[in-house]
Swiss-Prot record:
The lineage of its organism: Eukaryota, Viridiplantae, Streptophyta, Embryophyta, Tracheophyta. Its main location: secreted. This is Peroxidase B. It is an enzyme of class 1 (oxidoreductase). Keywords: Glycoprotein, Hydrogen peroxide, Oxidoreductase, Peroxidase, Secreted. The keyword Cell wall biogenesis/degradation does not apply. It is found in: Secreted. Belongs to the peroxidase family. One of its GO terms (biological process) is hydrogen peroxide catabolic process.
Amino acid sequence: VEMACPGKVSCLGDKAITVLSENNPLTGTKGEIRMGDGFNVEEEIEKVLEQVGKTTFDVALYASGSWKKPQPLAVMVATLAVMQVRDVVWLSALAMACRLLMDTFAEKYFLQPVLQPSYELFKNAGSNMDGTVTSFDNIYYKTNSWASPLSIRGGYPMHSTSNMGSQIYQDNPVANCLDLSSLDLANR
């Protein structure tokens, strides 16, 4: 990113605008935004969407661990010096598992379920339980949106197969990956 946009702290916004503007709703082509570590996902994407306007494009946003800058050799040696063998094995296994989740994240999980009309089959959510709250249920479960539709931190929706039509939020596998840069291994 820095090589493509010299002199800028972040050019993710410029790249995202380019990707979003290349989407064509008539032909069904989709764009993809790849980003690396160190960016505030929600703030950057919100800036982009404010400039180009809210769209209904299905934009897959996921973190790619291969974009992270390599650590200097001195930092790596100092880190390994204070770690025990079991720590290295455990962290390596965790990093591999998290990398696998990040690489397959966009393929497995819907980020914008409102773009999937087939999931909105239950028009009378809650009517079988209590008729007095049907209107509330329909409004709440059908229109309650996330803080940011492109957020990867809040959890991804899993749609219930019951006649309630409610959304069950589960933990996001990418958000659960440990940020190894936050570990203070030198002061254990």
